[in-house]
């Protein structure tokens, strides 16, 4: 019976929304960073193979791609650490809320998060002498004092969400370019569906700002473009950009879920604090 009660208490304190958001965030970031990195490398190969033979014409593009790839490394590391912090914050604040509302009473939360959130003094301390503090308990207390303020995470997560919306919008640009290229190739493959001459159907990389206007040839037309679309490099890069876009969307959903959960926890703690920790 004691084991069953312990499991029930643990399940009550689990922030399911934060757990789901963390899994979604890690999966989305992994998809965005991994596929985005490889898609940028594939784009570099396509440009230097089919659209320009002079290295100086696409040298700046290579530097930009390398810079984006380093940014991707930073994004992966940041979201890994921040996702863990948000998950820990969800556990701490959910446990504190359940304790305040009388739904959950953790046995070993003395002087940690609950007293930090509720403002109450630590309870149950012995006056006979101070007990030795283990390293893990000390770390938990330090985390509790910092994580017990969901208002901090609401503001930070809000700013991160705004920035990620911009990244999400930027990740749609290469998908749009590759999709237009694929549509053009379909028109070349089935000339009966269009009245335009096949030789005039082209993809001009200079038009999208990928190459300078003096780049040669800079564009590919007709059957040459169709041959590029049939290559495994083009197909793989196109699908990798789509996967990266989906990963960015999943990460955005995870951030919104985090923000809603942190806002709810903050609101509940504020309301219960103003009403002298009364239930509602």
Curated annotation (Swiss-Prot):
Disulfide-bond pairs as recorded: 185-229, 202-221
Lipid group attachment sites (S-palmitoyl cysteine): 7, 10, 140, 142
Pfam family, one: Myelin_PLP
Ranges annotated as spanning the membrane: 11-36, 60-88, 153-179, 240-269
Membrane topology: Multi-pass membrane protein
Subcellular location: Cell membrane
Cytoplasmic side, ranges: 1-10, 89-152, 270-280
Keyword line: Cell membrane, Disulfide bond, Lipoprotein, Membrane, Palmitate, Transmembrane, Transmembrane helix
GO cellular component terms listed in the entry, alphabetical order: myelin sheath; plasma membrane
Main subcellular localisation: membrane
Signal peptide: none
UniProt family annotation: Belongs to the myelin proteolipid protein family.
Summary of the function given for this chain in its UniProt record: This is the major myelin protein from the central nervous system. It plays an important role in the formation or maintenance of the multilamellar structure of myelin.
UniProt protein name: Myelin proteolipid protein B
Source species of the chain: Xenopus laevis (African clawed frog)
